[in-house]
């Protein structure tokens, strides 16, 4: 499960998130990236904001017709688009080896989902930056979404969310936490490739 070339970072999500993302993309200009959002509405909005800032981005979600979706996929693979803003519908069966960054605009619903989505970066063994924006408000929003679902489903959903939140709030090596979640032991004290190892938080 260890992907040594992936860099994991969690940033606080503030009202300047769009500006933060634009700055990040411009600093990585010409590189391919995927930005995951939880809602289709946010996917559309963010893609428009990026386009207005002269970033070659396109939206992708299950509500679009299949010909638009496959055209977007093809253009991404052929490097005609730099950035895909997507719901988690994107990426199944997409094997673009040189995706250089994966950004989570919203906290993922589970660590397994997070691992799969971040895993789309750096498949060629090159650089892969995995940046997640996190706020406790997001967490409350997701918990609200679950109301009205069967109790058992709510319980599982909450537990998965709590695990993701604990990961986001932790000051421990992110690689160690992820591998531990999948039942693997990571013996190094410092992976040298996550925010917590490179910039330890003051306890």
Where are these regions (language model features)?
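Helicase motor core with emphasis on the C-terminal RecA-like subdomain
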Residues: 1-151, 159, 186-188, 193-196
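Cys/His-rich short segments
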Residues: 160, 165-203
């Amino acid at each position: 499960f260890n992907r040594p070339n992936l860099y994991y970072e969690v940033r606080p999500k503030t009202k300047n998130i769009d500006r933060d993302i634009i700055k990040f993309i411009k600093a990585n200009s010409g590189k391919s990236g995927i930005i995951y959002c939880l809602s289709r509405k946010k996917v559309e909005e963010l893609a428009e904001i990026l386009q207005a800032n002269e970033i070659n981005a396109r939206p992708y979600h299950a509500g679009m017709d299949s010909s638009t979706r496959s055209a977007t996929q093809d253009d991404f693979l052929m490097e005609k688009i730099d950035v895909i803003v997507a719901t988690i519908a994107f990426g199944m069966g997409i094997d673009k080896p040189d995706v250089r960054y994966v950004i989570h605009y919203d906290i993922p619903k589970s660590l397994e989902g997070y691992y799969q989505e971040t895993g789309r970066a750096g498949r060629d063994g090159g650089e892969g930056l995995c940046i997640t924006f996190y706020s406790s408000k997001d967490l409350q929003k997701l918990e609200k979404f679950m109301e009205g679902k069967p109790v058992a489903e709510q319980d599982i959903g909450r537990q998965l969310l709590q695990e993701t939140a604990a990961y986001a709030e932790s000051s421990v090596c992110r690689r160690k936490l992820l591998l531990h979640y999948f039942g693997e032991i990571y013996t190094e004290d410092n992976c040298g490739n996550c925010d917590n190892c490179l910039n330890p938080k003051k306890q």
